[in-house]
Amino acid sequence: MTTNMLDLFIEEASEHLQALNDNLLQLEKDPTNGQLVSEIFRSAHTFKGMSATMGFQQVADLTHAMENVLDEVRNNRLAVTEHLVDIIFTCTSHLETMVSDIQHGGQGAADISKTVADLEALLHPEQETDLTVEKTYRIAIQIEEAAILKAVRAVMCLERLAEMGIISETTPDREAIELEEFEQSFEVVLESAQTKDEIKAVILDISEIEKVTVTEEVEEVQVIEPIKKAAKQTTKRLENKTIRVQLEKIEKLMNVFEESVIERARIDEIAEKTNNKELMEHLGRFSSISKEIQNGLLNMRMVPVDSVFNRFPKMVRTLAKELGKKIDLVIEGADTEVDKIVIDEIGDPLVHLIRNSVDHGAETVEVRRKNGKNETATINLKAFHSGNNVVIEIADDGAGINKRKVLEKAIAKNVVTRAESTKMTDAEIFDLLFDSGFSTADQVSDLSGRGVGLDVVRNTILKIGGKISVESSENAGSTFRIEIPLTLSIIQSMLVATSERRYAVPLANVAEAITINPADIQHVHGKDLINYRETIIEVLDLGECFHETPLNDTDELLLLVVKNAKRTFGLIIKDIIGQREIVLKTLGGFFSESQIAFSGATILGDGRVVLILNLETF
C-alpha cells in the first residue's frame, strides 16, 4: 500500500463520512425521502468497497452490516425510525474513530460487535439468511430516431433504473443526457439485485425505446471500483482545471515567500541608507509583483469555514438527545473562506461555545412551553466577511444570561465590589463570564459548567489577534460574536520605539499619532487619563507596560492612539519608525507568562527581532 493510496483513502473516507452524517440528519427530518436513503446507501456501499480493497476488514464489515439494513430501507421492507437513525449514527461515530486510527498508522480496529448486533437485530430473521446479491450491469439504451423529446425519454429511463438499484456511471454524463447532447443511444452502469430480463423489460416498457442491451460486468469491476472512481474524480478535477495540493507544500512555499519579504526589507534598509533612487524604483516594482504572489499564496490557503462547521450538526443532535432537549442548528455562510491556519485554531473555541448554547442556552421542552416558546430551540451559527476579518456568530433563542446572577457571583468571588457592580454596563457584566474559573451554573454538568470553557475560548481567540463579545437578553437568548483575521501570515504594521525596544503595532488598530503636554494627563483612581477629541481615554506608557524605563520628557510626549474591541486608548512612545509589511512568526513556548500580550514576532531588515503587540489584551 503506497502513501498516496492511503492518503486518497482517508480523503475519500472523510468525504463519505461527512455525506453520511449530513444525509442522516436530513433523513431524520424527512424519513420517507427515498432519494436520501439511496444517497446514504451509496455512501455506505462505496465505503465498503474502498475499505475491502485497502484491507481494512473491520471497516468493511461494519459498512457491510450498514449496507444490509439500508438495502431493506431502500426496498421499503424496513421503515426509517428514530431508533434506526440512532444506530446508523453510532456506526458513523465508529467509522470516524476507525478512520482516525488508520490515519495515525493503525488498521482501523474497534469493538463494533454490539453495533453490528444492533444492526442485525433490525433485520427480520428470514432476510438475514436470504439476502439478494447485487450485480453490476452495463446497459446500452437506444432511442428511436424519430423520437421528438429524446432527453425526456432518457431521463425516464434513468429514473426507472434508479428505482431498481444504484446508477454508478452514465455515458455521456447525466447533465449531457438532460441537455440532449447525444445522438440516439447512451449507456448506464447499474448495480442491482434484479435480473437482466427484469431490467430490460422495465426499460422497453417506456415508449419510443428502440433497443436495450443488458450485459453483466465481470467481478473485477467491483474490485477496482475505488481506483476507477479515483481516476474518474481526477479526470473531473482536470476538466474543471483544479488540483488538490497538500497543505505542507503550500506552507513550504509560503515560508520561502516570507523569507523573501524579510530579504526585501533588508534591501529597503540599504536603499534608504545609500539613497539609491534607481534601487528604490526597482524595489517599488518588485513590491507590486511580490504583493500579487502573496495574494495568490494566501488565496491558495483559504478554505471554507464549512470544514469546521460540518462537525456541529451531529454534535448538537447527540447532545440534545442526552439532555432531553429539542434543538435545531441553522448554519449560514458555511462557504465563507478563511486562512487554513485560522481554521485550525477556531475549532475548539467553537465547540466550547456551541456546547455552552446547548447546555445553558437552550431550555428543556417543558420550560419553553411554559414560557410560550416553540418547544424546539434554535441555535444559529453564522459566518461572514467584514473587511479583512471574518465574523462568526453563535446565537440561540434560549434563556439568555441572568445579569443579576453574574454580578452576585462576581461579588462573591471579589472580582468586583457591590458599589462597582451598580455602575457596570451590560457589556462589562457579560465580560465577567470570560474570567478564569467563572461560572454561573448551579450544577456541574458533563458538558460545561466547570468554569474552564469561556476563559479558554477568549485566550485562544486573543492569541490569533481576534476578539469576542456577548449580547444577551433574558428569556430571548444570547449571541457570541467572534471576529478573527482572514490570515495570520503577513500584516501591515506601524513600527514604534520605546526607551529600550521596538514594537510592531497592527496598522488596523492605529487611529492616529499626536503630541500631548504631560501636564494634560490627569491621575484618577490609579489611572492616567486625557481628554482626546471630547472623550476621556486612558494613557499607558508602552515601555513601562513591559518594565522598561518610563519616558520623562517634560515638554511634550508622543501618543499613539489605538483601538481594540472594547475601547480607545493611548500609548506613550518615544518615536514612530514607520509603516512596514511584516511577516508574523509564532512565539512557540517563549514568553509563556506574557505571551498573550503579543500575537507573535517579526524579523526586520537589519536583523532585529521585534515583538508584535496584541492590543486586544490591553
UniProtKB/Swiss-Prot annotation:
The gene is cheA. The keyword Kinase applies. GO terms for biological process: chemotaxis. The modification Phosphohistidine is found at residue 45. Involved in the transmission of sensory signals from the chemoreceptors to the flagellar motors. CheA is autophosphorylated; it can transfer its phosphate group to either CheB or CheY. GO terms for cellular component: cytoplasm. It catalyses: ATP + protein L-histidine = ADP + protein N-phospho-L-histidine. Keywords: ATP-binding, Chemotaxis, Cytoplasm, Kinase, Nucleotide-binding, Phosphoprotein, Transferase, Two-component regulatory system. The lineage of its organism: Bacteria, Bacillati, Bacillota, Bacilli, Bacillales. CDD domains: CheA_reg (cd00731), HATPase_CheA-like (cd16916), HPT (cd00088). It comes from Listeria monocytogenes serovar 1/2a (strain ATCC BAA-679 / EGD-e). This is Chemotaxis protein CheA. Its EC number is 2.7.13.3. Its main location: cytoplasm.
